Design a protein with these regions (language model features):
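Residues within membrane-spanning alpha-helices of integral membrane proteins
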Residues: 3, 48, 103-107, 111, ...
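Selective hydrophobic functional segments
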Residues: 45-98, 102, 186-232, 236
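Transmembrane helix exit motif
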Residues: 57-67, 88, 104-129, 242-252
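Alpha-helix N-cap/start motif
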Residues: 39-40, 70, 171, 201
Length: 252
């Protein structure tokens, strides 16, 4: 029964992740509720072992239908991986609890900005080309990769917003690009969790399969309904992140 519950949660998480990120809002609470006595690191590692496959398949699906800026995306993904490793190291040196208190406020500002800019991310008009785009994308990958390793919640949303606001992408193309960087940051985290023995591999396969199925459904929905649909899901996910992080910070 436990495997069925977390596999269904993984499927739904894969669907949401494929559209705009935020699947951890679904899968992690399901894992913690189903296995309350497990070590948190093991549940985080098991979550990554499933979600990385859904994100990877979403990247492939998007690349078949959406132009992927590989020239800027590959360096961004590489630096995202390095940034995630650096962030994971930094969390062993500095207590990240101070950042937890600021996160709901940052997400709130991001949401307000998105809502007030009605046309934000509705049309695809990249602002930069060539080396300039490569450097800005690399900076996005490094900074948000570090954040993912150091703290984590909302990484997908921050990536999408950065591509929309800084590079001029629409929400669909931004989500597609964000997937590649997310695969890299997830790979870094999964490597660390694996080396520390914090992955339940007997759970990983069925959860990964379910996540991939959800990912394929989510990608189809995003491609079918376009940037406006992805924008609406983005707003919903950010609002859910605000509620979750505010509760964890101030009420729990």
């Amino acid at each position: 029964m436990e495997l069925l519950i977390v596999s269904l949660a993984s499927l739904l998480a894969g669907l949401v992740d494929a559209i705009v990120g935020g699947g951890g809002l679904i899968l992690l609470p399901a894992l913690f509720a189903t296995f309350p006595g497990a070590a948190p690191a093991t549940l985080f590692g098991t979550n990554k072992s499933a979600s990385i496959w859904g994100t990877a398949f979403a990247t492939v699906q998007y690349s078949r239908q959406v132009h992927m800026p590989w020239r800027s995306l590959l360096p961004a993904a590489g630096l995202g991986l390095l940034g995630s490793l650096a962030g994971a190291w930094a969390v062993t040196q500095v207590d990240p609890s101070w950042f937890r208190k600021a996160l709901p406020v940052l997400l709130g500002l991001l949401l307000i900005y998105t809502l007030t800019k009605k046309d934000l991310g509705r049309s695809h008009a990249p602002r930069f080309a060539g080396a300039t785009e490569v450097w800005i994308a690399a900076g996005i990958g490094l900074v948000i990769g570090f954040y993912d390793g150091f703290f984590g919640p909302g990484t997908g949303s921050f990536l999408v917003f950065a591509y929309v606001r800084l590079l001029g992408y629409d929400f669909l193309n931004a989500s597609a690009a964000a997937k590649m960087i997310n695969v890299a940051t997830n790979l870094a985290a999964l490597t660390l969790f694996t080396l520390k023995g914090h992955v339940w591999w007997h759970m990983a396969l069925p959860m990964a399969l379910a996540n991939v199925v959800g990912s394929l459904i989510g990608t189809r929905l995003a491609l079918k309904h376009g940037a406006g649909f992805v924008r609406h899901v983005f707003i919903f996910v950010v609002l859910a992140l605000i509620c979750k992080t505010a509760y964890d910070t101030w009420l729990r």
